Curated annotation (Swiss-Prot):
Gene: bglapBGP
Residue intervals of the Gla domain: 45-91
Binding site for Ca(2+) 2: E65, E68
InterPro entries: GLA-like_dom_SF, GLA_domain, Osteocalcin
Molecular function as annotated in GO: calcium ion binding; hormone activity; hydroxyapatite binding; structural constituent of bone
Signal peptide from the UniProt entry: 1-21
Post-translational modification: Gamma-carboxyglutamate residues are formed by vitamin K dependent carboxylation by GGCX. These residues are essential for the binding of calcium.
Chain residues that bind Ca(2+) 1: E68
Binding site for Ca(2+) 3: E61
Residues recorded as bearing 4-carboxyglutamate in the entry: E61, E65, E68
The name this protein goes by in its record: Osteocalcin 1
Compartments, as annotated in UniProt: Secreted
Length: 95
C-alpha cells in the first residue's frame, strides 16, 4: 500500500511539473494584436470578399463584341461560352 501511494504521489508530481513547463514555455501575451483579434488586410479582404454578381445582358454583349474581333476567341465562345472565352484570351472580366 505504501508503494502505491508513493507511485501516485510521484506521478502527480511529474504531471504537475510537466503541465507547469508547458505553461511557462509560452510567453505571456498582453496585446490584443498578438492574441489573434486582428488579421492582415489581405486575409480580411479574402474573407469578406463578396460573391461575384451575374453579368447583365449589356455587359455580356460588350464582352461578345470584344471577343468577336479575335477568330480563336469567337470559336471558343461558340463552344465554351462567352465568359470562358473572354477570360482565356483577355484575362479577368473588368466589371
Amino acid at each position: 500500500m505504501k508503494t502505491l501511494s508513493v507511485l501516485v504521489l510521484c506521478s502527480l508530481a511529474v504531471l504537475c511539473l510537466t503541465s507547469d513547463a508547458s505553461f511557462s514555455s509560452q510567453p505571456a501575451v498582453d496585446t490584443p494584436a498578438q492574441e489573434g483579434l486582428f488579421v492582415e488586410q489581405e486575409q480580411a479582404s479574402s474573407v469578406v470578399r463578396q460573391a461575384p454578381k451575374e453579368l447583365s445582358l449589356s455587359q455580356l454583349e460588350s464582352l461578345r463584341e470584344v471577343c468577336e474581333l479575335n477568330l480563336a476567341c469567337e470559336d471558343m465562345m461558340d463552344t465554351s461560352g462567352i465568359i470562358a472565352a473572354y477570360t482565356t484570351y483577355y484575362g479577368p472580366i473588368p466589371f
